[in-house]
Each structure stands twice: as C-alpha cells, then as structure tokens.
Design a protein with these regions (language model features):
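N-terminal Rossmann NAD(P)H-binding glycine-rich loop of SDR-like oxidoreductase domains
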Residues: 3-23
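Rossmann-fold cofactor-recognition segment
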Residues: 31-45
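NAD(P)H-binding glycine-rich loop region in Rossmannoid oxidoreductase-like domains
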Residues: 43-81, 92
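Catalytic helix-loop patch of NAD(P)-dependent Rossmann-fold dehydrogenases
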Residues: 80, 115-154
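Conserved Rossmann-fold NAD(P)-dependent oxidoreductase catalytic core, especially the SDR/UDP-sugar
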Residues: 88-130
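Glycine/proline-rich active-site loop of Rossmann-fold NAD(P)-dependent oxidoreductases
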Residues: 140, 152-155, 167-177, 194-205, ...
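Mid/C-terminal beta-alpha module of Rossmann-like enzyme folds, strongest
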Residues: 190-252, 257, 263, 289-291
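Amphipathic terminal alpha-helices
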Residues: 257-263, 270-293
Length: 293
C-alpha cells in the first residue's frame, strides 16, 4: 500500500511518516526540503499534487496554516491553503483512484464552546464549534468540504482532531496530557489505526491523551483543580511536589478521546510520565520550567 503524507516536514507529518515507513510505501510532500519530503512545493500546486498522487492508495493530509500563522498570513491565504487546497487534494485523489483520505485537524476549532462559564468544558465530537479565529473557521470549513465529498463520491474520509501537540514548559505539558494534550507519537499511531481500521463513510474523532477525569469533575476542575489532581492522579501531584512545581487551581477544559479509542482501537501511551522522562533526557520535545525571579 502506498501512502502520501502532506506537510511531511512538520512535527506531526514527520512523526506519521516515520511511524508508517516500516510497513507502507510512504511518500511525503512539503514546501520545505526535508528527509521526509519526497516532493517539494506548494500544496496548492495542482500539477505537483497530480505527480505526487501516482499509484497512491491513501492520502494523509496534515499540511496547513496553523494558529501561530494568524496575523502573519492573510485570511485569503488561510482559505486557499486550509480549505481550497484540501478540497482540491481530495478531488484529485478521487481522480487518481485513492481509496481513503485521512485529514489531520484540530480540537482548537471548537473555540469558545470548549470553555463554558463557571466550569471546565467537557469536549467531545458532539459539541458544536464556536470558532474564534480564521484558523478555527478554515479548519471547520475544510471538514465540511470533506464531508460533502465523502457523501457525494463515496470516499472513506476520517478526520482526526488532535489536541495540543507542541513543545511547552514541562509542567504545562504534564498537566495537559491528562486533559487537553497529546504526544506526536500517539498522533502518528492514531493515523496508523485509521488506515488499518478502514472505516466507511465520513468519521470524525478527537485525538487526545487518556483522561482520568469524568464529566462530573468539570465544576471541581474549574474551581479546585489542585484537589482533583491530588485525588485522581496522585503520582502527578507527587512529581510536582518533588520538582517544586505548583499545581493549578483551575483547568478550563477536558478533551474526551473515548470515541477514537473505541472505534479506531487506538490507545495513547505517552502520558505525563513520558513528558517528565523527556525533560530529564533534555529532549527538544519539551521545554524546561523556568524558575520565577
């Protein structure tokens, strides 16, 4: 089976490329030259896409403008890259005989729906988004385009909405692994599971770390998060104490990835212990915690 990964020079695209390359014939495409970019160029370039799609069975589309690009690129750029290029890629894939399309999206698109007043938000795939930025709006629009394409052309499309997945200070990353964060390696594995599960139709899943919290914890997490953490994750509380870090008194949301775990057979394994281990190993995947003066 041959798989095309767009955005293959990025953190997530590269992680997916490396995860798949031992079992699949993988080709990558990115605007940046890289060891995992077999095709180099603009995701909007139709002729480049057509060349890259030769003999491709599965498309994994990670290429996009992201939140850090807001204010640096025009709204038109966001629309042409995140929406129009996504639609074009799917349609050209259908012409080329692609059998499956996997779209890497984001939990950020839920916007203010993630943070209701007075309690932590419990966010699953049934929540109606309330976008706040052009990034959110274009990701929502891209998902809508893909759903319409899936229905019209009978192309199996799986959307994977990943939570926070970038280097942050270790205390923040460790906390978020239980509520709103994910390791790039677990994201890559989710894409592998989506390929192998071969779900029909259009499907959407939140990809985030396993949470020990439940819906009934939403109000306590917002008002007394430190007490909830001590009760639910004593090992994390102990690690914070040993390292001289303070537990937060409030958390504003929890992303629930239960549906992905159940329907894709996906099981994230890189929890807060992985964050601490990477910190101790001086990995570039996690930032040190700076002591306040």
């Amino acid at each position: 089976m041959k798989v095309l990964i767009t955005g293959s020079a990025g953190r997530v695209g590269r992680a997916i490329y490396i995860k798949l390359m031992s079992n699949y014939n993988v080709v990558g495409m990115d605007k940046a030259p890289c060891s995992t970019a077999d095709f180099v160029g603009d995701i909007r370039d139709q002729h480049l896409i057509q060349r890259a799609l030769q003999d491709i069975d599965v498309i994994i589309h990670t290429a996009a403008l992201h939140a850090p690009h807001v204010g640096l690129h025009s709204d038109d750029d966001f629309y042409t890259i995140n929406v129009e290029a996504t639609e074009q890629l799917a349609l050209l894939g259908i012409e080329a005989g692609v059998k499956q399309f996997i779209f890497t999206s984001t939990t950020a698109l839920y916007g203010s729906a993630s943070t209701p007043l007075g309690q932590a938000g419990w966010v699953n795939e049934d929540i109606i988004p309330k976008p706040k930025s052009i990034y959110h709006k274009t990701k929502i629009a891209a998902e809508a385009k893909l759903e319409a394409i899936s229905v019209k052309h009978k192309l199996p499309i799986t959307v994977l909405q990943m939570s926070r997945c970038f280097p942050e200070p270790a205390d923040t990353m460790a906390l978020f692994r239980n509520s709103r964060g994910i390791d790039a390696r677990d994201v890559a594995n989710a894409h592998l599971c989506a390929i192998e599960k071969k779900l029909s139709g259009f499907n959407r899943f939140i990809i985030s770390g396993v949470t020990p919290y439940s819906k009934k914890d939403c109000q306590p997490l917002y008002k007394q998060a430190d007490k909830v953490i001590i009760e639910k994750i004593p090992a994390l509380a102990d690690a914070f104490k040993e390292r001289g870090w303070l537990l937060p008194t409030s958390l504003d949301r929890v992303y629930d990835s239960t549906r992905a775990q159940q329907q894709l057979g996906w099981h994230p394994k890189h929890d807060f212990n992985s964050v601490l281990a990477m910190l101790d190993d001086e990995s570039a995947e996690v930032l040190p915690v700076l002591k306040s003066n």
